From Swiss-Prot:
EC number: 2.4.2.30, 2.4.2.-
Keywords (A to Z) from UniProt: ADP-ribosylation, ANK repeat, Chromosome, Cytoplasm, Glycosyltransferase, Golgi apparatus, Hydroxylation, Membrane, Metal-binding, NAD, Nucleotidyltransferase, Nucleus, Repeat, Telomere, Transferase, Ubl conjugation, Wnt signaling pathway, Zinc
Protein name per the record: Poly [ADP-ribose] polymerase tankyrase-2
Sequence positions bearing (3S)-3-hydroxyasparagine: N203, N271, N427, N518, N586, N671, N706, N739
Organism lineage string: Eukaryota, Metazoa, Chordata, Craniata, Vertebrata
Assembly behavior: Oligomerizes and associates with TNKS. Interacts with the cytoplasmic domain of LNPEP/Otase in SLC2A4/GLUT4-vesicles. Binds to the N-terminus of Grb14 and TRF1 with its ankyrin repeat region. Interacts with HIF1AN. Interacts with RNF146; this interaction leads to ubiquitination and proteasomal degradation. Interacts with NUMA1.
Molecular function terms, GO-annotated: metal ion binding; NAD+ poly-ADP-ribosyltransferase activity; NAD+-protein mono-ADP-ribosyltransferase activity; NAD+-protein-aspartate ADP-ribosyltransferase activity; NAD+-protein-glutamate ADP-ribosyltransferase activity; nucleotidyltransferase activity
Renumbered residue ranges of the record's region HIF1AN-binding: 545-553
């Protein structure tokens, strides 16, 4: 082996005895070894390019260049005739040398120029042996990729793997970078995969997981290109993973149609079963992969096979439609297969009226096509049986082949006779523009040609390639067809053509026969009578010719059909007739002009419209690459819009061009999509670009107000994002979902809040938008706010937090008189006589300072919900206060002296000592506890005490026995009315269940209200015109904290951007969840919910001088000289009065009423 090892490095050993070589040859060898391309170019001649180193190993220049890795020199030598298979003394070819020294690029170059990857030297060493021995991993991979055989043994019986360096063994076992290979197949990294792929690892299995092969992963992840490459390089379509799944299972489970098709075309078994006996069809059907199911069935998948649970694919189909489709297509494919095999028994088993015209989903073949092509003797019987059952004689495949085409091509003359007798069109054209005669002539079927000619097949029809049947046949066929052609053109034919051109119906009727109806103008353009009649607008002639067998698909020598002629000259009636008789609207002439190209170029608007209505494709290009739109003249804007179709409507909606929208829109396209962009509808664009009139027109004509684009946005999202208040209001009017979410769970309120759209936020909230909804990031609209006013608005709309509450103070007998509370709540001089509530409500405007003092003495008690001890003789709150300080032993002193909490607030060390509290520590504890109680903190414990500073809101619970409670309840119940909307907004009810009535105490709001009341009174002759009115709003929580805020009012209200009140509680009840009832209660989304609690405000409202109004009028402020607007009932106007103020401080929320509406007796659900 020592001699052979020297041979392996032949290039290195070649210098020995070089002096014996002629100088020019020696110089060439040296230049090749050193990589001196310029010298090589000077020295190489055709005679010297394969010269030998006679003093050494008989190496050629290519041996030297390859061994030393001189790629440029190798490339030049190969281009100039170097022999890639030349052997030196040891039998080595240049490839051996390049592989031995690891020159991968040179190896690749030599292999591309035909070097044998399995060439053997004198010791049977291959290039792979050389690379493996030296551990040249890259070279091993290149050799294996080019067909190197790893099992070849040298003269010692050793393979490349036996001799391989440890670093190269993994390549030869298929384990080299296996994980990277599998990952590249999964991720679709072609370059990475091809750098690692060899025949030894193409079917490697993952070491963990499901033991998948690269093909399993590529199929499951829909890597179409990777699948193609793997299959090309020998991937096993039958390879199974740990669960016995084949790659086809993966592709079908995920619905990857192209991958499935590739696998079945490469022999994948469509009925392969995994360990649980699931077939690929089980996988596809259970996941509702409809198209994949159809594909599998067309390749023989059986939907009746049962898995281990005794379930078939049909059983696993999730929808009735898919179950039905699986059964139907299985029967259909069974019928097609029986027809191919001409099996009468099976045909009868599967044949029915429903199945007789079943089409193969991919090829569009019918059973009649299959029978016509069948080589079996009973095909004629099968065809007759199918035709008796109603098979369509002229049905076409995907390539436009009729059964007559198929039978003619196969010389099945018996079938030709049968289908012609059943009215087969003998001149029907396939996708190449060929008749049955073309196909028979091309195949040299002389008898078939003769038979077709006898049935009137036209030998002069020119195919799309410009050939007649005569030109496609052999000598015998040509002779036969020449005779038929000369017989076919007579004087009568010429007269018929002239009559059709002139519109002479009588002459046409006289001359027209079955043989002559499709005669040709031989001397001219090969036109038929129908071509002439269509081009010259001879409507009656066209009608007659079509009724008597004229071929609507006949082409002249330019490839024009009659429809081209009619469209080019704008003959609408003729074009309509031709289309009704089956003319193909997308047929193309030799220059690939369709009828639509003709009509568009000539400015024929109505013709274009007709063609488009019947499926003409406006994207088809002629030979110059022009679509019909490209050929329209600049002035024909109507045709341009027509051809642009949906794109034109979308553009018009975007630009706000109402006239164009009206012209272009129809029920079919009003919800069309921007397929090149975000899949927006016209309404999305109109809403986003603030085109109010366009939006309104689209909504009136069927636009889907809640249509989602690609990102899940509805038009309201767009309007909200860009702050288009009027458009948003219009969308809401047409029932846009105010809480609709996009793919990232953003609502319109998120959009408006993020962009600082205050008015839009107010509008959305007023119509039931939920401010608590979170997007995928967990953010509410409030979290996205940047503007302070929007932040305030959203904060106000958030669900009510726990407010401090207390029961209305009630002093026990012997402490205060029974009228103490009423006195504290009564007004100074007198109550306004205009208040509409019961008389006890007329005394509610008393001194707020007195009220606060009373509240402070009972707040802590009310906050805990504990009941007062009726027999204690003292306010329970002082008892709780003393107990929390740990001074219970002092209770006797407080009871004896009748010290209540409000009295204690005024006492100091001196007063406490006088009543008998002598210990300084006790007095200090009491005084500090009181200080904390009034310092603004909240809680039972004096060290975390109730806010009584006057800056916040306190709710006083009224007892049901209290006259105040009863008066408010009476006002609520007595003002319920039946509304025109039948309860749509506020629910169906006739009374309430009053759960709670709370008095709202807020010193700041009260002072603001009284100040404004005084101003109004002074401006209105000392008459404030104060009323007690109801107000419904989703902002109740904000109102009782901050008062009414006119900044958030919506201008779209009946009387503009004001704050609305009603004297009827049922009227205000319509607004508790938003305008028009919003979206109903938060939990059930029901406007007539009888379970959820509602809240209504009974407010003190200063109307001052009110402006009477009977019809809608948009106002941002009250009319000059007035303080409010009163909407009076009128015919076709309001049914119940409404009161509107335009300044928030003109109303004070006096009572918060919590209630339920009650279902009327006898009312049935739904």
């Amino acid at each position: 082996m020592s001699g052979r090892r020297c041979a392996g490095g032949g290039a290195a050993c070649a210098s020995a005895g070089a002096e014996a070589v002629e100088p020019s040859a020696r110089e060439l060898f040296e230049a090749c070894r050193n990589g001196d391309v310029e010298r090589v170019k000077r020295l190489v001649t055709p005679e010297k390019v394969n010269s030998r180193d006679t003093a050494g190993r008989k190496s050629t220049p290519l041996h030297f260049a390859a061994g030393f890795g001189r790629k440029d020199v190798v490339e030049y030598l190969l281009q100039n005739g170097a022999n890639v298979q030349a052997r030196d003394d040891g039998g080595l070819i240049p490839l051996h040398n390049a592989c031995s020294f690891g020159h991968a690029e040179v190896v690749n170059l030599l292999l591309q120029h035909g070097a044998d990857p399995n060439a053997r030297d004198n010791w049977n060493y291959t290039p792979l042996h050389e690379a493996a021995i030296k551990g040249k991993i890259d070279v091993c991979i290149v050799l294996l990729q080019h067909g190197a055989e790893p099992t070849i043994r040298n003269t010692d019986g050793r393979t490349a793997l036996d001799l391989a360096d440890p670093s190269a063994k993994a390549v030869l076992t298929g384990d080299y970078k296996k994980d990277e290979l599998l990952e590249s197949a999964r991720s679709g990294n072609e370059e990475k995969m091809m750098a690692l792929l060899t025949p030894l690892n193409v079917n490697c299995h993952a070491s963990d997981g499901r033991k998948s092969t690269p093909l399993h992963l590529a199929a499951g992840y829909n890597r179409v290109k990777i699948v193609q490459l793997l299959l090309h390089h020998g991937a096993d379509v039958h390879a199974k993973d740990k669960g016995d799944l084949v790659p086809l299972h993966n592709a079908c489970s995920y619905g990857h149609y192209e991958v499935t098709e590739l696998l079945v075309k490469h022999g994948a078994c469509v009925n392969a079963m995994d360990l649980w006996q699931f077939t690929p069809l089980h996988e596809a059907a259970s996941k509702n992969r409809i198209e994949v199911c159809s594909l599998l069935l067309s390749y023989g998948a059986d939907p009746t096979l049962l898995n281990c649970h005794n379930k078939s694919a049909i059983d696993l189909a999730p929808t009735a439609q898919l179950k039905e489709r699986l059964s139907y297509e299985f029967k259909g494919h069974s019928l097609l297969q029986a027809a191919r095999e001409a099996d009468v028994t099976r045909i009868k088993k599967h044949l029915s009226l429903e199945m007789v015209n079943f089409k193969h989903p991919q090829t569009h073949e019918t059973a009649l096509h299959c029978a016509a092509a069948s080589p079996y003797p009973k095909r004629k019987q099968i065809c007759e049986l199918l035709l008796r059952k109603g098979a369509n004689t002229n049905e076409k495949t995907k390539e436009f082949l009729t059964p007559l085409h198929v039978a003619s091509e196969n010389a099945h003359n018996d079938v030709v006779e049968v289908v012609v007798k059943h009215e087969a069109k003998v001149n029907a054209l396939d996708s190449l523009g060929q008749t049955s005669l073309h196909r028979a002539a091309h195949c040299g079927h002389l008898q078939t040609c003769r038979l077709l000619l006898s049935y009137g097949c036209d030998p002069n029809i020119i195919s799309l390639q410009g050939f007649t049947a005569l030109q496609m046949g052999n000598e015998n066929v040509q002779q036969l067809l020449q005779e038929g052609a000369s017989l076919g053109h007579s004087e009568a034919d010429r007269q018929l053509l002239e009559a059709a051109k002139a519109g002479d119906v009588e002459t046409v009727k006289k001359l027209c026969t079955v043989q002559s109806v499709n005669c040709r103008d031989i001397e001219g353009r090969q036109s038929t009578p129908l071509h002439f009649a269509a081009g010259y607008n001879r409507v009656s002639v066209v009608e007659y010719l079509l009724q008597h067998g004229a071929d609507v698909h006949a082409k002249d020598k330019g490839g024009l059909v009659p429809l081209h002629n009619a469209c080019s000259y704008g003959h609408y009636e003729v074009a309509e007739l031709l289309v009704k008789h089956g003319a193909v609207v997308n047929v193309a002439d030799l220059w690939k002009f369709t009828p639509l190209h003709e009509a568009a170029a000539k400015g024929k608007y109505e013709i274009c419209k007709l063609l488009l209505q019947h499926g003409a494709d406006p994207t088809k290009k002629n030979r110059d690459g022009n679509t019909p739109l490209d050929l329209v003249k600049d002035g024909d804007t109507d045709i341009q819009d027509l051809l642009r179709g949906d794109a034109a409507l979308l553009d018009a909606a975007k630009k706000g061009c109402l006239a164009r929208v009206k012209k272009l829109s129809s029920p079919d396209n009003v919800n069309c999509r921007d397929t090149q962009g975000r899949h927006s509808t016209p309404l999305h664009l109109a809403a986003g670009y603030n085109n109010l009139e366009v939006a309104e027109y689209l909504l009136q004509h069927g636009a889907d107000v809640n249509a989602q684009d690609k990102g899940g946005l509805i038009p309201l999202h767009n309007a909200a994002s860009y702050g288009h208040v009027d458009v948003a209001a219009l969308l809401i009017k047409y029932n846009a979902c105010v809480n609709a979410t996009d793919k990232w769970a953003f609502t319109p309120l998120h959009e408006a809040a993020q962009k600082g759209r205050t008015q839009l936020c107010a509008l959305l909230l007023a119509h039931g938008a939920d401010p608590t909804l979170k997007n995928q990031e967990g953010q509410t609209p409030l979290d996205l706010v940047s503007a302070d006013d929007v932040s305030a608005l959203l904060t106000a709309a958030m669900p009510p937090s726990a407010l401090p509450t207390c029961y209305k103070p009630q002093v026990l007998s012997g402490v205060r008189g029974p009228g103490a509370t009423a006195d504290a709540l009564s007004s100074g001089p007198s109550s306004p006589s205009s208040l509409s509530a019961a008389s006890s409500l007329d005394n509610l405007s008393g001194s707020f300072s007195e009220l606060s003092a009373v509240v402070s003495s009972s707040a802590a008690e009310g906050a805990t919900g504990l009941q007062r001890k009726e027999d204690s003789g003292i306010d329970f709150s002082i008892t709780q206060f003393i107990r929390n300080l740990g001074l219970e032993h002092l209770m006797d002193i407080f009871e004896r002296e009748q010290i209540t909490l409000d009295v204690l607030v005024e006492m100091g060390h001196k007063e406490l000592k006088e009543i008998g509290i002598n210990a300084y520590g006790h007095r200090h504890k009491l005084i500090k506890g009181v200080e904390r109680l009034i310092s603004g903190q909240q809680g039972l414990n004096p060290y975390l005490t109730l806010n009584n500073s006057g800056s916040g809101t306190i709710l006083i619970d009224l007892s049901p026995d209290d006259k105040e409670f009863q008066s408010v309840e009476e006002e609520m119940q007595s003002t319920v009315r039946e509304h025109r909307d039948g309860g749509h907004a506020g629910g169906v009810f006739n009374r309430y269940n009053i759960l709670k009535i709370q008095k709202v105490c807020n010193k700041k709001l009260w002072e603001r209200y009284t100040h404004r009341r005084k101003e109004v009174s002074e401006e209105n002759h000392n008459h404030a015109n104060e009323r007690m009115l109801f107000h419904g709003s989703p902002f109740v929580n904000a109102i009782i904290h901050k008062g009414f805020d006119e900044r958030h009012a919506y201008i779209g209200g009946m009387f503009g951007a004001g704050i609305y009140f009603a004297e009827n509680s049922s009227k205000s009840n319509q607004y508790v969840y938003g305008i028009g009832g919003g979206t109903g209660c938060p939990i059930h989304k029901d406007r007539s919910c009888y379970i959820c609690h509602r809240q209504l405000l009974f407010c003190r409202v200063t109307l001052g001088k009110s402006f009477l109004q009977f019809s809608a009028m948009k106002m941002a402020h009250s009319p000059p000289g007035h303080h409010s607007v009163t909407g009076r009932p009128s015919v076709n106007g309001l049914a119940l009065a409404e009161y509107v103020i335009y300044r928030g401080e003109q109303a004070y929320p006096e009572y918060l009423i919590t209630y339920q509406i009650v279902r009327p007796e006898g009312m049935v659900d739904g």
